[in-house]
Design a protein with these regions (language model features):
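Short S/T/G/P-rich N-terminal loop/turn motif that feeds into the first structured element of a domain
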Residues: 24-114, 118-237, 246-266
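Bacterial Sec-dependent N-terminal signal peptides
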Residues: 1-32
């Protein structure tokens, strides 16, 4: 009897765990809100940067394409940023959670990837190709459930891809800020001023939670500055930002101005 009760207890724990997973994993139905992975690689010096570029360009991105993901973004800080030469941002979009969960297994079985990326994947412990990397996993907002690729005629080293992170003091404040973007109309204002958004999304796993992140794009730094001036002075923003329900929904804003690499799909 005791053994049966013990087994029943284990099963109860597993069932409870299983049904708690959808809080993170179930997400929206297939074909609706996408999921995004942002990898942030920390590097030191030109040597690591060159090895990172070689790996991403010739091994990782082609393998991800073979795995069924046609678009991968790679970005680096602008030249006047103190993080220039120290960080590489990787953006991978997934049509659903299953595609995210399957990618690792597909890469492990991809012999071409294993061969072409060997020097990076299995580098000597005392000569690593990067210091560390962190992963942020996000779910797209319902008012922009699918990412977009902007189209510019300017060279890549002139384009600005602005990644923003908005942290909130509490879960309730974070939810209200997401509401402000969606139902409140903040996304619509960005559309009106021509901010060329790539995505808006809620961080569901990662550091500095609760928070949301989004990326807008511009043909040049001049276009970037003009768009933000237009946003700040837009009558819809003045009305929206004055509403009491949205007060104090953001406690910290982090802004990262980036250029796409020459081999980025963006």
């Amino acid at each position: 009897m005791m053994k049966r009760l013990k087994n029943l207890g284990i099963i109860t724990v597993l069932v409870t765990y299983f049904f708690s997973i959808p809080v993170i994993c179930k997400g929206a139905p297939k074909g609706e809100n996408m999921y995004y992975e942002i990898r942030i690689y920390r590097i030191s010096g030109p040597s690591q940067e060159a090895r990172m570029d070689e790996f991403l360009k010739n091994a990782f991105i082609p393998a991800v394409h073979r795995a069924g993901i046609s678009t991968v973004g790679v970005f680096k800080p602008v030249e006047n940023d103190t993080a220039f030469g120290k960080v590489v941002y990787l953006f991978i979009p997934y049509k659903n959670m299953e595609q995210f969960l399957e990618l690792g297994a597909k890469l492990e079985k991809d012999q071409e990837y294993q061969n072409s990326g060997k020097d990076f994947l299995d580098a000597p412990f005392d000569d690593p190709p990067f210091n560390r990397y962190e992963t942020v996993f996000l779910k797209a907002f319902k008012y922009m459930p699918v990412f977009r690729i902007p189209s510019f005629t300017t060279p890549g080293n002139e384009r600005i891809y602005e990644l923003r992170s908005y942290e909130s003091a509490t879960e309730a404040k974070a939810t209200k800020k997401i509401h402000m973007f969606n139902e409140g109309g903040e996304i619509g204002i960005f559309e009106k001023i021509g901010a060329n958004a790539v995505f808006y999304a809620k961080v569901i796993t990662g550091s500095k939670m609760p928070r949301l992140m989004y990326m807008t794009t511009y043909a040049s730094i001049k276009s970037h500055d003009e768009c933000w001036d237009a946003f700040k002075n837009h009558p819809d923003w003045k009305t929206l930002s004055s509403l009491e329900e949205y007060k104090n929904t953001v406690s910290k804003i982090s802004v990262y101005l980036l250029h796409p690499t020459s081999y980025s799909d963006f």
